A protein has these predicted regions:
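A short glycine-rich, His/Asp/Glu-containing loop-to-beta-strand
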Residues: 1-30, 36, 86-87, 91
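Short hydrophobic/aromatic patches on the structural cores and recognition surfaces of FHA
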Residues: 6, 44-46, 60-62
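Conserved A-loop
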Residues: 21, 45, 70
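Short beta-strand His + acidic residue motifs that chelate non-heme Fe in jelly-roll/DSBH
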Residues: 30, 48-49, 55, 71-77
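Glycine- and acidic-residue-biased ligand/ion/polar-headgroup-sensing regions
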Residues: 34-51
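Short acidic-glycine-tyrosine-enriched beta hairpin
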Residues: 51-67
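Ligand-binding loop in jelly-roll beta-barrel domains
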Residues: 58, 67-93
């Protein structure tokens, strides 16, 4: 059984997959990337900040956004968060 969730044309994009560990009480200032980003939380809880909005995601949650929009990351807990991150990097000239 398949349930349609997301479709994105990938022509000329580079796929990068990472496992990311965000240590307790960590804050990363906003930055932007030249990629579409898909994040799935394996363990822990983190907050992604976008302009005036903050999104909290925990185990089993998935977040997809355009990394061109500046975004911050915060782990305000005492536990390390573990994320599965997929980057679709745009071509550069």
């Amino acid at each position: 059984l398949y349930k349609y969730l997301l479709s994105q044309e990938l022509a000329n994009y580079t796929l990068r997959v990472n496992e990311v560990h965000i240590t307790p009480n960590t804050y990363r200032k906003p930055l932007s990337t030249n990629a579409l980003e898909l994040i799935h939380v394996l363990e822990g809880t983190v907050q992604y900040g976008f302009k005036d909005e903050e999104v909290s995601i925990g185990p089993g949650d998935t977040l997809y956004f355009d990394g061109i929009v500046a975004h911050s990351v915060r782990n305000a807990t005492e536990l390390t968060a573990r994320l599965f991150k997929v980057y679709l990097l745009r071509p550069t000239d």
